[in-house]
Amino acid sequence: LLLLTLTGLPLLFRGEINAWNTVNLPPRGEPMALSEIWAGLPQGTAAVAQAFPTKEILAVTPDGEDGTLYFRVKDRGGKAGRSHMRMGGEQIMYEVRTGTLFNRQERVYRSEAVQEFMHTMHILHVRLGLEEGGRDFLAAMCVLSVISIVSGVYLYLPMMKTLAFGTRRRRSSRLFWSDWHKLTSAFAGTWAALMCVSGVFIVLYSVGMRDYQRTAQTMAAEHFSAQEQSASLLLPEEALAQMQEAFPAKDIISMRLPTADSALYVFQIAEPTVRATDFALGTQVYLAAGGGEPFLVPVPAWLTMAPFFLNLHIPNHELT
């Protein structure tokens, strides 16, 4: 718990710290509806193709926080790095309002030490720097921590009933600090239990979502292999328009373009969120590169709890 607390504290303010530490980051815009951001897809695609002719666009993800489209790219003929939506890989930002481009690989840091520190805090917090083994170990320790907190309340609560909650005695310094300890431990224990429970679910979500995406990919391949495909190819904005027409009440939170290995557009759709920073659970929807009926693979029912736990765990310092 001490490790998770020490590493989690700077991560709470990762966005603010990274914004301060990146000296050439474009100014952030105001929040913007995802549908308005997607309206800039044709212009963004053209701008990226013109400015980076040697790059191939793999996926596009909107950021409702500041009205930006993230184009995940790779060198033509090259290999794409590990990535997920706006995380990882080579990402080119397109500011919809101004039409400006910024390649995130060209970021200049005020302090490389701060950047390295934040990266270290992240990998320690999520997996102890040990990949999946470290992640699973942290989940197991969180389970033990919750058991310890709950059992501690059960064991010590009867002994504390003789004293009203919040009472601070001043007869001696030992009693004074003991009462403060009881008061703060009630809040700290509750917070620790919430963070541990939500953290365990995040690990389960990570495993479950990976399995869901693999299953969805297999189901989509089988579904479209049994159909005759059109020889013509949809432009990204045409594929997007079909999805918006098919799912008008949903937000489109990601779009992956067809590749040599898969002639399918892969979209993630989600329920609209209250805030731009809220987590949105993506449901996989596939569309043939030549158009046709979309193929939706529902998310397992238990994964629908993910938004509650991830919003509780990650952006909990945002009170507005």
Give the role of each language-model region.
Residues 1-320:
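Conserved histidines in hydrophobic membrane contexts and catalytic metal-binding motifs
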